[in-house]
Amino acid sequence: MAISIKSPKEIKALRKAGELTAQALALLEREVRPGVSLLELDKMAEDFIKSSHARPAFKGLYGFPNSVCMSLNEVVIHGIPTDYVLQEGDIIGLDLGVEVDGYYGDSALTLPIGAISPQDEKLLACSKESLMHAINSIRVGMHFKELSQILESTITERGFVPLKGFCGHGIGKKPHEEPEIPNYLEKGVKPNSGPKIKEGMVFCLEPMVCQKQGEPKILADKWSVVSVDGLNTSHHEHTIAIVGNKAVILTER
């Protein structure tokens, strides 16, 4: 399937969805602390989104039961909110999507709960810095595979590894569209191959960072993804539009 080019009107609608996504994440960022349960946070986000005349995009998507993916400590992505109460030293990944008037926004961040270990601080910084470096590297005409190479090299230069088998993606009237954008260059693939970035494209970049091994394992809940190394992980994501030959973050907080 071809990668869709969005009109200025569509990008305006996607910007609206992105802004609401960012506001919902900012709300959670303010409320995350020791003593708060994951289900409480999920309800806060859902109530805020609905009160803004929008819809939590993840609730029911592929059967996901909640509004926010909450990935605790070793869980990289797709964690299901539970009654677990956050404790000092935890790290929590928050990934949420919003649908407004038929258009989607999608963003994620990983937060420390109080004081965390120096290794976890480096881990959180890696996914955030990898995301921003990739965004700042975007140029019209470059290949998406070049972005994958940039993401991988930024992660590995910091001593970590990208999660395999999961990727960034296009977004628009569907939460997941073409292209798929891995955080690594697949074996045998050249960076100067495949589709190129063009004006009007809208997509999500989301580095998912593991400590020692990038091979994934899905837990018994059939959603939560961890690394086979069982160590803590980190994940950041933004929705980006190509406007005026440059990358514009639609989910900037």
Swiss-Prot record:
Cofactor binding note: Binds 2 divalent metal cations per subunit. Has a high-affinity and a low affinity metal-binding site. The true nature of the physiological cofactor is under debate. The enzyme is active with cobalt, zinc, manganese or divalent iron ions. Most likely, methionine aminopeptidases function as mononuclear Fe(2+)-metalloproteases under physiological conditions, and the catalytically relevant metal-binding site has been assigned to the histidine-containing high-affinity site.
Binding-site residues for a divalent metal cation 1, renumbered to this chain: 95, 106, 237
Any one GO MF annotation of this record: metalloaminopeptidase activity
Cofactors (names): Co(2+); Zn(2+); Mn(2+); Fe(2+)
One of the protein's GO biological processes: proteolysis
EC number, as in UniProt: 3.4.11.18
Binding residue positions for substrate: 78, 176
Chemical reaction(s) catalysed: Release of N-terminal amino acids, preferentially methionine, from peptides and arylamides
Residues reported to bind a divalent metal cation 2: 106, 169, 206, 237
Transmembrane segments: none
Superkingdom classification of source: Bacteria
GO cellular component: cytosol
Protease in keyword set: yes
Keywords, comma-separated and alphabetical: Aminopeptidase, Hydrolase, Metal-binding, Protease
Listed NCBIfam families: met_pdase_I
Family according to the record: Belongs to the peptidase M24A family. Methionine aminopeptidase type 1 subfamily.
Self-association and partners: Monomer.
Function (record text): Removes the N-terminal methionine from nascent proteins. The N-terminal methionine is often cleaved when the second residue in the primary sequence is small and uncharged (Met-Ala-, Cys, Gly, Pro, Ser, Thr, or Val). Requires deformylation of the N(alpha)-formylated initiator methionine before it can be hydrolyzed.
Name of this protein: Methionine aminopeptidase
Species this protein is from: Helicobacter pylori (strain ATCC 700392 / 26695)
Gene name for this UniProt entry: map
